[in-house]
């Protein structure tokens, strides 16, 4: 969140407008809906699956488009080519959180994005033993983010940097296993009598299957699904697991599971969660190696 807040606050001022989607990570949603209005920054939520809805939301004060490559936790896949083109057409800065895809599966800068943000805590590190954020992209924009990071206190300590560098050395070895395992579990869950729906880019039944083949063809180590019986059934399911641990975070070598309604998206209003696809019984899994 330090990387996200430092980057966005370095680019936005009172009176500016940003277009994003309600499907984003709960912490980012909170930043944009709770803090940005206090700073006089307007935010419009559009449909991540419909670039034309982003274009319709643009006004004379719009400064920036913000999306996630693969959304947390519903795993909707953004058409980054279309979004980058839209931003360039309207002279806007384009920013994408690429955490769920990682640089192994998707390179948004090559698609035309100005800035790419990663949670270093997750797959880049891969060992669940640090918290970090990364932003890469245009040098002129990075300079402002670096200055904001310094002034806002989001600086990384040397030990954390060492651990992150260590983890990134094995990213390309780990990710094929993460994605293969998550694809297999998604396949087995699909059609199970206790499951309402499964979200994973590898499934032909998934709404963004075709977009995913173009944007992030290697996939992701994440998956999500809904259990019949609502949130209580989902919690019983989670607590009956013996190998997969109930815990927040994701992207480590171990497998973790949570219910977003009481973790990552607990402060997102229920109606917003439902509209985003976080229905009763919704479960998010990070599949390890």
Annotate each predicted stretch with a short phrase:
Residues 195-283, 287:
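Conserved C-terminal alpha-helix-loop-beta "cap" of PLP-dependent enzymes
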């Amino acid at each position: 969140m330090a990387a996200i807040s430092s980057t966005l606050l370095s680019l936005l001022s009172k009176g500016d407008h940003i277009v994003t989607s309600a499907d984003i990570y709960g912490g980012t949603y909170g930043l944009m809906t709770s803090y940005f209005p206090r700073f006089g920054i307007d935010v419009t939520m559009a449909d991540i699956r419909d670039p034309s809805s982003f274009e319709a939301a643009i006004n004379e004060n719009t400064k920036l488009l913000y999306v996630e490559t693969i959304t947390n936790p519903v795993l909707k896949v953004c058409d980054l080519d279309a979004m980058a083109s839209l931003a360039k057409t309207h002279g806007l800065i384009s920013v994408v959180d690429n955490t769920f895809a990682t640089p192994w599966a998707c390179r948004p800068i090559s698609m035309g994005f100005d800035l790419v943000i990663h949670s270093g805590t997750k797959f880049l590190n891969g060992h669940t033993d640090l918290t970090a954020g990364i932003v890469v992209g245009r040098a002129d924009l990075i300079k402002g983010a670096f200055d904001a990071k310094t002034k806002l206190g989001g600086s990384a300590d040397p030990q954390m940097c060492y651990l992150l560098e260590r983890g990134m050395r094995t990213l390309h070895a780990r990710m094929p296993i993460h994605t293969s395992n998550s694809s297999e579990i998604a396949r087995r869950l699909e059609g199970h009598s206790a499951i309402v729906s499964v979200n994973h880019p590898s499934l032909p039944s998934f709404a963004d299957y075709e977009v995913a083949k173009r944007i992030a063809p290697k996939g992701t180590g994440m998956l999500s699904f809904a259990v019949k019986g609502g949130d209580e059934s989902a919690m019983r399911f989670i607590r009956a697991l013996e190998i997969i641990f109930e815990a927040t975070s994701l992207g480590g070598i171990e497998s973790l599971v949570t219910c977003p309604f009481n973790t990552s998206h607990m402060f997102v209003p229920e109606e917003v969660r439902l509209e985003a696809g976080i229905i009763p019984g919704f479960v998010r899994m990070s599949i390890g190696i």
